[in-house]
Design a protein with these regions (language model features):
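VWA/integrin I-like adhesion module and closely mimicked acidic/polar interface patches used
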Residues: 32, 163-212, 217-219
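Loop/turn elements at helix/coil->beta-strand transitions in domains of secreted/extracellular proteins
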Residues: 55-58, 89-95, 151-156, 184-191, ...
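DG-centered beta-turn motif at the end of beta-strands
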Residues: 63-65, 77, 96, 143, ...
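Solvent-exposed loop/turn segments at secondary-structure junctions
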Residues: 64-69, 100-105, 130-133, 163-167, ...
């Protein structure tokens, strides 16, 4: 009788897998429990002025010098920025700096691209007025300082301008290259977008992108 009971116990218990600590494992859906985190950290592709950029955080440095009003570029900037920012998911982060004789930042810290922050940044960019010199250097450094505070893995910086950096009557191209190189200790890609019809600023914008692992783009 005892032998029969042992056989019956073995038949009923043996089909169930038991983990090393004696607990039966739980049934998990295919892919495990980490799918949500992977989706949250996935990079996004944005289209800004016709150029495509992939990342999970985007930081703009935007020219608002007087020449940006000559052919309506400042209005185009506002439209392009609005469309691009609205395309970001709330998982992405971003920052915006605008420059002319001086520079101003929408926020000194990187922010999530949630509806409230996107609305605030769009309203801020829409209020920009074109005036003054093209003092890019300090603005680019400020943009990098904001980006450096972001913990995302695929950060991208986008510099938009319609010419070489002239500040208070002097060409500051060499100084800008040096200042950006010193500030970019995280080696964030610095992508440049040159929107002028002439070729005056192409060489500088190409060099700025090349020295910082970015791309140069000139819309046609």
């Amino acid at each position: 009788m005892r032998a029969l009971l042992l056989i019956l116990l073995f038949v009923f218990i043996s089909p169930f897998d038991v983990s090393a600590d004696g607990r039966r494992p739980l049934d998990l859906p295919s892919g495990g429990a980490g799918d949500g985190d992977e989706e949250e950290d996935a990079p996004e592709t944005i289209n800004f002025w016709g150029g495509e950029y992939e990342g999970d955080a985007f930081f703009w440095c935007l020219d608002k010098s007087c020449s940006m009003s000559w052919n309506g570029e400042i209005q185009d900037l506002k439209q392009e920025f609005t469309q691009t920012l609205n395309s970001l998911s709330s998982q992405a982060e971003f920052g915006v700096v605008a420059f002319s004789e001086g520079h101003i930042a929408w926020n000194p810290m990187p922010q999530r691209a949630n509806p409230a922050n996107k609305g605030s940044a769009i309203a801020w960019v829409q209020s920009l007025q074109a005036a003054g010199w093209t003092c890019l250097g300090p603005a680019a450094v400020e943009t990098l300082n904001i980006a450096n505070q972001c913990s995302k893995a695929m950060k991208q910086m986008l510099v938009l301008s319609d010419g070489e950096p002239y500040c208070n009557g002097s060409n500051t191209a060499s100084q800008v290259l040096n200042d950006v190189a010193a500030a970019n200790w995280q080696q964030i890609p610095v992508n440049t977008i040159y929107i002028a019809a002439d070729s005056g600023g192409i060489s500088f914008m190409q060099q700025l992108a090349q020295q910082n692992n970015g791309t140069f783009y000139q819309p046609q």
